[in-house]
Amino acid sequence: MLQFSTGNPRVLTNYVTLNFGKDTIMSILKKLAGETLSYGFSTILGRSLNFLLVFVHTWAFLPAELGVNVKLYGYVAIANIIYTYGMETAYFRFAKEAPEKYYQLIMTAIIVTSGFFTLFLFLFAEPIMVQLGYPGKGLFLNWLALILAIDAITAIPFAKLRLENKIKTFVKAKIVSILINVGLNLFFLMLLKPLQAGEIQIDAPQFLRDLYNPGIGAGYIFLANLIANASLFYWLSAEFKAYRWRWDWSEFKALWIYAYPIMFMSLAAMFNLMFDRLLLESYLPEGFYPGKSSQVALGIYGNCYKLSVFMSLAIQAFKYSAEPFFLGKKTTENSKENLALITHWFVIVCTFLWVGVSCNLFWIKTLFLRRAIYWEG
C-alpha cells in the first residue's frame, strides 16, 4: 500500500491512499510507459524531422513571408477540432461495445461533415482570406481545407489502430507521411527556390526551374503538407477497405451527446493556446517593435514558439497511449487512483523537460533559427 502526500507542509495528515498492490502499480506504469514509448517513437522521430523544417523555413523566408503560415496554421489547429467534433474520443468510449458498428457510423458522419465544411471553405476562400488580410491567397485556404478534410477522415482509422494496439501500422503511416512532408519541403525550398532565383548554378532541366512559382512562396509549405497527408490513404488502405456506409440517427445522437462537450472543451483549450498567434498581428500597435511591422513580429514569434516542440513531443506521445488505455477499458476499478498516480509522474517528467529546454535555449536558437533576425524572439 502506497501513500502520497498532498504537498502541503502544514497539513501532514492529508494523504491520498492508493488501495492496490505494488505489483498492480508497476504493471500499470509498465504498460502505459511501454505504449507511450512505442507511440513516442513515431511522434518523437516525426516531430523531430518536422522540427528540422524550422531550420529550412527560417533559412528560406523572412519573418514577414512566414506570418501567413503562422496565422493560418493557428486557425487550422482550431478547425481540426471542429472537423472531428469530439468523435475520436467518442469512438474510444463506444467502440469497446461494438467496434465495427461505431467505426462505420463515425466514419460516415466524419466523411459527410468534412465534405460540407470543405465545400464551404472552397466557396468562400477568397473573401475569407481578404478578411484575414491576405488578399489573393485563396489558393492557400483551398489547400488547407483539403488538409483538414484528410486529417479528419484519417483520424478515426488511426484511432482504430490505437484501440486494436496495431502500433506498427500506426507508426509506419505516421513516419512515412512525415518523411514525404520533409522531403517535399527540402525539394521545394532548398532546391527549386534557389534554382529558380539563380542562387544554385547547376545544369538542371528548364522544367525544374519553372516548377517553382515565387508568387506562391511560403504556400509551398501548405502544398507539401497536403501531398504528405494524401499519402495516408494508401497506408491506411486496409482500414478504409473495412469501412461500409452506415447510418443510425439514434446511435449518432448518443455519440453526439457524449462528443459535443469534449469538442467545446477542446476548442476552449486550443483557443487558449492559439489566440496569441491569431490576434497578435491585428492588435499589436504599429511601431511597437521599432523597424518591424506586426506581420514581421508574428513571423518571428510563431517560429520561436516552435521551440516548444520538445515539450509537446512528450505530451502527444502520452496522449496517444493514455486515451485508449483509460477510455478503452470496460471496467473502472481503481480508475481514480490509477489516474492520480500516472498524472503525478507525468507532471514530474514534464517539469524536467521544461527546465532542460529553458536552460539550453542559448545554443538551440543558433542551431534551428538560421537568421539572426529570429533570435530576439
Task: Place the predicted regions along the sequence by residue.
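Specific pore-lining/lateral-gate transmembrane helices of multi-pass inner-membrane transport
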Residues: 94-109, 300-377
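Interhelical loop/hinge segments that connect adjacent transmembrane helices in multipass membrane
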Residues: 19-32, 196-218, 224, 231-273, ...
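Helix-terminus/linker motif at the lipid-water interface of multi-pass membrane proteins
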Residues: 51-65, 129-130, 267-310, 328, ...
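Membrane-water interface segments that mark the loop-to-transmembrane alpha-helix transition
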Residues: 34-46, 72, 77, 81-126, ...
